[in-house]
Amino acid sequence: MYNFLSCKKKSIILQVLLIICTYNILLNFVNIFVNNNEKNHKNKYENRIKSFYVEAYNWNFLEKWKSINTNEKLEYKINYNIGLNIDAEIGDFGDYNSDVKTDLILFKYDKDKLLSTIFIYVFSVKENKFIYHTEVSFEGKIMNVTAIDLNFDGALDVLVLFKDNKDSSKSNKYYVAAFLQNDNDQLEEIWNSKKKEQNDESITDNEEDNIYYTNIHPLICDINNDGLPDIIGQQSGGPDGFFRFIWINTRNGFKSFLWKNINIFKYSELDEITNPNSSAIVDINGDCKSDLVFTVYNSYEKRIGLEIWLNKIIDGKSFYVKYSQDYLLPPNSLQVLFGDFNGDGSIDLVVPTCVKSSFCNYCCVSDDKIYFIPNIQKKICDSSWKKPDETKCRPASNLCSESDFEFQQNLTDDFISVVDTSGLHLSGNADYPYYLSVGDIDDDGYLDLLITLKNDKGQKYVRIYKNELKIHYEENSLEVRGFYNFYQFVTSPEESVTDVYNAAFFDIFENGVLDILIFGKYITSNKKTKYAAVGFIRNNETDSLFLKSTALNGICVNDCYKEKDKITTKTLGGNAHGPTFKITVIDVNGVKSSRIGVQKSQSAHFPLQLPYVLFGLGRTSNYVEEFYVGMPTHEQKYYNMWVSIIPNSHIIVIPYPLNNSNKWQIQLSVNPSKKFYSILYITLICLSVIGVLIFILDRKEKVEDSKEELGFKSHFVIG
């Protein structure tokens, strides 16, 4: 008995020592990890490229925010070593080489040669930076770039909007050129509407529909349900002073058709699309099927509004049906943003406004505001214990059901956020209409804004405006959100930095954490203007989780090489416009909510949207219970649903075939935390120590048992 108690005491002492040992190992690992990070950042800072310099710091009044913990302040460190010293303008984002890394599509116009060049820079995992990949040049001045799969082969192609550089008139005459990625990863021009016009070559089956250019930046979406991206444009002329048309994609080019001659639109009176415009393909009524939204000049109200065309099935056939009335935007509206800003599962609007002046090419000079305009429709049913009334709410098992909707009409001060009171104004002008960048910086489930500002002296600022609850209306359970200055990036006061023309959220290392890319211009020592960019990397983590989702465009991915001459190695370059995602998540208080996101919803005026949807899940220890994806098709079955998705993962949806959603598949890859390997090493060390101790104690116990057994046998005499 004494030996047993002695052994037990020794076991307890060893366990205490084991805990102390584990704590010391963990502490040392954390210290080494932090010190290495600080050294790396210091070295990178010392080796920075000094041509384009930006500083960053937290905004002071953040200290009084009750909702932000001291431990949760964002920390951004500038990184000059990720290959962003590129003398070209940013055009779009996409996965060019199908390695699940987002690449850069850039361009530059040479005034002397009258040529534009498209550059592809891919992110190299080996070198941990963006590296040059390929380029292509053509005659014309680029006005917009869209990276998208044009011929349905899974490889990322490039669609360019350009002006004739020999046209001295100030008319908005935009032509289109299509560049396909060939088997050698190079871009080849396969269609050019300007060349078709010069050669007097017909691009339509009906001579009335022969259209070579558009007067607005077009909307890109699949109109005729073949999975190929089409183009909706507008031209001056006709009895109304304008007419709409569509360039239908034929895989190796486009054919033009007048809007009125296409039988999928329930035709009614049209208004003129504005220039600039922020038209979109986005789910307005919550049925997981994207609708068409155009920013138009309402001829009756003499104001800019949203013209909405709902994607509906009528008597077994698909139509776009015009909504009964336009939604009139606030006066002096700029580029409209679409997203689930209050986290209730419906697409809301965020509209920046300002007073402009013709003296600075219609830039903002006063009264800069941000309007939050909620989309009021059926929410998710709040209880799973009783049968829900589906006329008042959506059950989690049927989130993709159509609902009546209404955008908030009475926009009081509760719905308005003031941008700045110290003389800063929203960036952009008539030549470069500026979009705010949208993303959830802290994965709390609410979309924040990245805004470029300027003062009267020309100095540029980039700020993160945090999305916070402003007021809750009890009568209709409506959360009103506001946007507040949260984090600031300031350009160098030196005169060499002449402009910051754009900024965007970007997940550089594909870890579910949004970093910042800032794009600008500077003057070299020999007085030449060059483009450049800098990256700010998030170097701290919150305890919030995320879900990243990407939908392909409907190409076959698995086992389709049997039907082709060769194996297709590129499948992730679709950059599909309009797929809709809906998820449900339960927070730490047990409250279930739904979220919605739309992939690549806009295409005009360089919106710089990422080729995926990043959901912030907040603090939750649960799975994503339901995950829906809907494709912008005209099929009866256009969406599918999966359950129990692991957080902190990237889901790739393979909607093949497009006409049968029951056969759609998903691929899931889990993104480990930054501390995953440290935790793994510490766990292995602890398990090894525990294993050794168990072995020692087991051997000792067997020795003690052997001695006791011998002592017990000595009391017996064998005769």
From Swiss-Prot:
May protect the parasite against attack by the host immune system by immunomodulation. It is a single-pass type I membrane protein. The chain crosses the membrane at residues 678-697. Keywords: Glycoprotein, Membrane, Signal, Transmembrane, Transmembrane helix. InterPro entries: FG-GAP, Integrin_alpha_N, Tip. The keyword Lipoprotein does not apply. It is found in: Membrane. The keyword Transport does not apply. Disulfide bonds: none annotated. It comes from Plasmodium falciparum (isolate 3D7). Glycans are attached at N144, N277, N410, N540, N659. This is T-cell immunomodulatory protein homolog. Pfam families: C2_ITFG1, FG-GAP_3. Residues 1-32 form the signal peptide. GO terms for cellular component: plasma membrane. Residues 33-677 are extracellular. Belongs to the TIP family. Its main location: membrane. Residues 698-719 are cytoplasmic.
